[in-house]
Every structure is written in C-alpha cells, then in structure tokens.
C-alpha cells in the first residue's frame, strides 16, 4: 500500500512537472482543542500507593495554538497541483488528565486534574494536493520541547490545592525519557486570492501528537508512561507565490 501511494504521488508529480510551477511561502496560525490519552504500566515491585499516584482515569480537554511557516515548490496544470512544503514553527500544546484516589491517612477521596503544557519548536514536511482553491495536506514531523509547565489541582470536599512545576530545556529530561514527540496532521484549507500571488487561507486540521514518554527519573517502578493526543481545530494564514484557482 505504501509503495502504491508513493508511486501514485511520483506519477502525478511527473505528469504535472511539465506544467506551470513556482515557489510558495506561507504562514499559518492554528488554534484548537486537544483530547489526551494516557497509558501507564507499572513494574511488579510498585506499591499500591505509588500506582494510585501515577494512574490516571481519563484525559480531559487541553488547548493548542501556534504559528508555522511554510516554504516549498508547487507544480500545477492551473486546476490541480501538488506542493511539497517544509513546515517550521512554534507550537503550544497542553495535555489534560483526570484521576482520583483514596488518601491512605484520611480515607477521603481525592480528585486530581493536571496539565502538561509544552512550548515546542516543530519541524516537518507538508505535502499538499490542490484542486482549484481547495487544498488537502498530510504533515509529519517532530516537536522539540523547549519549556514544560506541569500544573495539578487536588480537590478534597470543598477545598482544593494547586501545584506548579516548571522545566526548561535543560531539565525536561527530569520528566521525559525522550526529548522529542512526533506529530501527524491532516489539513484542509480554502484560498481566497486577494491579488496576484497573494492568498488568504481559511481551513481546519486534525492531528495527533504521540511518542511522549513521561517516565523521566521514574524508570524503576514504571515500565512505560505514555501520553498522546487527538487535536482538532481551525487555522488561518497567508501564502505568497504561485497560486491555483480564482
């Protein structure tokens, strides 16, 4: 299947390479929601109190935003085309988690809501398929965390306690075993050509961030502690260079 997709892409690119072509530059601002998924597996030596602290019942909604810059080349036959873009920028990604446990001392139920908020540099590629003013993209790349904020709020009856922890690029490995996360995204946008070689983009995206191993220093009692998300949102942007459509 993978070979068929690659061959189809190369065939279409070769077919269009004899048509009009040109460079494209652009910038995009995505804003959306993040739905988190969390899995943890403990070693056989982990005590129950330790498991209660690190086990999470479910994910909750986080917030994503950022700005990315694209540069690449478009080949087109005026109605349809293919572009291959480098996609570089900044992303703000938050992962929300919920859990609950019983305090061994007071025997009271404790509810916990926590967020891992990453400030990332991202780099990847974004091939796009164009038809008139519409474009569909499939992006893949990595995000490198530059700063991490971990916040947690503990609810007990009518009281709550908040904690915050901050990790710069030199200390993120206290929390993460790996130093990068992987992303995949599907994009859709519509171009409003406002003048020659300038277009306004309005669209949407759906994607996932994964490969986040939160073991950090907890490598003895935890065998794996993985965080991922499903991201959905809207995006606006501008592009400059060769365009398709009206």
Regions picked out by a protein language model, each given a short descriptive name:
Residues 38-47, 51-55, 91, 176-246:
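Predominantly the C-terminal beta-signal and adjacent terminal strand-loop region
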Residues 41-53, 101-109, 158-171, 216-217:
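Flexible, solvent-exposed coil segments and beta strand-coil junctions
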Residues 19-80, 231, 237-246:
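Short glycine/proline- and aromatic-enriched beta-strand/turn motifs that initiate or cap beta-hairpins
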Residues 4-14:
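Sec-dependent N-terminal signal peptides
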Residues 29-31, 35, 70-165, 180-188, ...:
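Gram-negative (and chloroplast) outer-membrane scaffold detector with strong preference
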């Amino acid at each position: 299947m993978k070979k068929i997709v690659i061959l189809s892409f190369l065939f279409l690119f070769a077919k269009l390479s004899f048509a009009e072509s040109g460079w494209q530059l652009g910038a995009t601002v995505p804003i959306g929601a993040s739905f988190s998924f969390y899995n943890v597996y403990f070693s056989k030596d982990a005590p129950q109190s330790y498991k209660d602290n690190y086990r999470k019942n479910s994910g909750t909604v986080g917030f994503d935003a950022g700005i990315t810059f694209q540069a690449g080349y478009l080949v087109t036959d005026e109605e349809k085309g293919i572009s291959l873009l480098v996609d570089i920028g900044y992303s703000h990604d938050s992962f929300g988690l919920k859990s609950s446990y019983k305090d061994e001392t007071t025997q009271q139920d404790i509810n916990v809501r926590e967020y891992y908020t990453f400030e990332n540099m991202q780099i990847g590629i974004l091939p796009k398929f164009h038809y008139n003013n519409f474009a569909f993209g499939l992006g893949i790349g990595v995000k490198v965390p530059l700063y991490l904020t971990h916040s947690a709020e503990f609810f007990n009856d009518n009281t709550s306690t908040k904690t915050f922890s901050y990790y710069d690029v030199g200390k993120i490995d206290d929390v993460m075993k790996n130093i990068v996360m992987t992303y995949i995204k599907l994009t859709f946008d519509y171009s409003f050509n406002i003048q020659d070689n300038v277009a306004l983009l309005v669209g949407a995206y759906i994607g996932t961030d994964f490969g986040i191993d939160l073991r950090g220093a907890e490598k003895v009692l935890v065998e794996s502690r993985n965080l991922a998300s499903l991201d959905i949102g809207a995006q606006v942007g501008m592009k400059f260079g060769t365009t398709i459509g009206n």
